[in-house]
């Protein structure tokens, strides 16, 4: 096989549709736009979501809920992740979690959740803990400190 033998796979390449290049091409005269009307015009067409004067779906459906401006968003870490990534007796702080790439940023704080198993004795400093996380950390002799 040589370079001149290479061909793209069957059906993987399509020819560009050249419009307005004579009647014989099949895309001449109106260039596939039909006759007159809004869509035949330059810059014509309706905006997305426009339903021809009928009340649009987005306005037919009732409004629901609101956005709580006081909502706190925590960076969450499970105890199972701490088990995998840290040595026995390690002290874990939000800065260490960012350094190790476990979380991207602290957001409104770090919350430790109780998913997974923990066998190592760790000192964990975070903004919030779930009840199950505290139980698992203390069960193996570790400390859960709220900062």
UniProtKB/Swiss-Prot annotation:
InterPro entries: Ribosomal_uL15, Ribosomal_uL15/eL18, Ribosomal_uL15/eL18_sf, Ribosomal_uL15_bac-type, Ribosomal_uL15_CS
Sorted UniProt keywords: Ribonucleoprotein, Ribosomal protein, RNA-binding, rRNA-binding
Tree of life domain: Bacteria
Keyword Nuclease: no
Record-level GO cellular component terms: cytosolic large ribosomal subunit
Extent of Gly residues compositional bias: 42-52
Keyword Ribosomal protein: yes
Residue segments, region Disordered: 1-58
Listed GO MF terms: rRNA binding; structural constituent of ribosome
Pfam families (UniProt xref): Ribosomal_L27A (PF00828)
Example of a GO biological process term: translation
Subunit text: Part of the 50S ribosomal subunit.
Stated role: Binds to the 23S rRNA.
Similarity-based family: Belongs to the universal ribosomal protein uL15 family.
Protein name: Large ribosomal subunit protein uL15
């Amino acid at each position: 096989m040589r370079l001149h033998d290479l061909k793209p796979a069957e059906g993987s390449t399509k020819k560009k549709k050249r419009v307005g290049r004579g009647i014989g091409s099949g895309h001449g005269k109106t260039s596939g736009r039909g006759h007159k009307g809004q869509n035949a015009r330059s810059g014509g067409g309706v905006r997305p979501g426009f339903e021809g004067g009928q009340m649009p779906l987005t306005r037919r459906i009732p409004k629901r809920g609101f956005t709580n401006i006081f909502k706190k968003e925590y960076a969450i870490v499970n105890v199972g992740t701490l088990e995998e990534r840290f040595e026995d007796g390690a002290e874990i702080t939000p800065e260490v979690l960012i350094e190790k790439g476990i979380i991207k940023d602290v957001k409104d704080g770090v919350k430790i959740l109780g998913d997974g198993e923990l066998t190592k004795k760790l000192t964990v400093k975070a903004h919030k803990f779930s009840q199950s996380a505290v139980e698992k950390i203390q069960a193996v002799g570790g400390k859960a400190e709220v900062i």
